[in-house]
From Swiss-Prot:
Protein name: Vetispiradiene synthase 3
Keywords: Cytoplasm, Lyase, Magnesium, Metal-binding
Function: Sesquiterpene synthase that catalyzes the formation of vetispiradiene from trans,trans-farnesyl diphosphate. The initial internal cyclization produces the monocyclic intermediate germacrene A.
Cofactor note: Binds 3 Mg(2+) ions per subunit.
Record-listed Mg(2+) 3 binding positions: 246, 250, 254
One example GO MF annotation: vetispiradiene synthase activity
Binding site for Mg(2+) 2: 103, 107
InterPro entries in alphabetical order: Isoprenoid_synthase_dom_sf, Terpene_cyclase-like_1_C, Terpene_cyclase_plant_C1, Terpene_synthase-like, Terpene_synthase_metal-bd
Sequence motif: DDXXD motif, positions: 103-107
Induction notes from the record: By elicitor from R.solani.
Species in which this protein is naturally found: Hyoscyamus muticus
Amino acid sequence: LHKSIPRVETRYFITIYEEEELKNDVLLRFAKLDFNLLQMLHKQELTEVSMWWKDLDFVTTLPYARDRAVECYFWTVGVYAEPQYSEARVMLAKTIAMISIVDDTFDAYGIVKELEVYTDAIQRWDINQIDRLPDYMKISYKVLLDLYKDYETELSKDGRSEVVHYAKERMKEIVRNYFVEAKWFIEGYMPPVSEYLNNRLATSTYYLLTTTSYLGMKCANKEDFEWLTKNPKILEANVTLCRVIDDIATYEVEKGRGQIATGIECYMRDYGVSTEEAMEKFQEMAEIAWKDVNEGILRPTPVSAKILTRILNLARIIDVTYLHNQDGYTHPEKVLKPHIIALVVDSIEI
């Protein structure tokens, strides 16, 4: 239960509790009403995110990109389901969808020279850089800059627009590391596992997503963002957890498409071990990372429990999305679809 998504477990526990002989009918009815009322808000938010995604029309203009708006929103409900985080969920869902577009540009479509210019343009974060880009990159570049401008406008209402800077810097960081990985793939370079992990931790997206998850939280102040920039142990553990679980789940697919610079392959070469032994090592790293996340939740820190809980919930999402070493993000029908239906499609019958 500790590694499960709280909102998912809430939905399933209501069904289980309903079968109990000694159930409290008033409490059960209240739980159902509470779930359905909050679900109505979640449905409204999903509609907003879906309409934003549809209006961008990436499915037509960037056909190489994954169409995962619903799955992106599901992740945000895992991070925070409470009604006061409505704005935060919408912001985070849009960011997850956007980083998927950027990732696919590096991973499946761009060539080195174009990717180098794209990377530099994002580092400069200036719309005047757009003319340097090929047409297909202009589309995602403009949307990316517009998105963060919208965040600044929205947060300025509460005098918090300056914290968007921290999310921008994390976006620049991940793009730099995407470019390194793209060169590895194109050049057929297999780095030492230490170099691999040093770069790939950033491209796990969890530095970016954790920072972004705080944008819409009015309780998150500049000091919280500063704390996060220092990459505290709990964040490093969560990023490592995301990286190694993803590497285990996607190994066969990446190997099948000729990608030699995978974590498993690098570890096998460096230590002269079999695939099974490398998998076991990565699983061990995941277990250690979970212990470090739990330690970080329990130990005194300069930030509040509300801030720490986002990191814990992001860890939980990884465990659910990659359950039984399946890539539930790329293939949501395998893992996430039943949860999505339960949380944002089907209401509970009163």
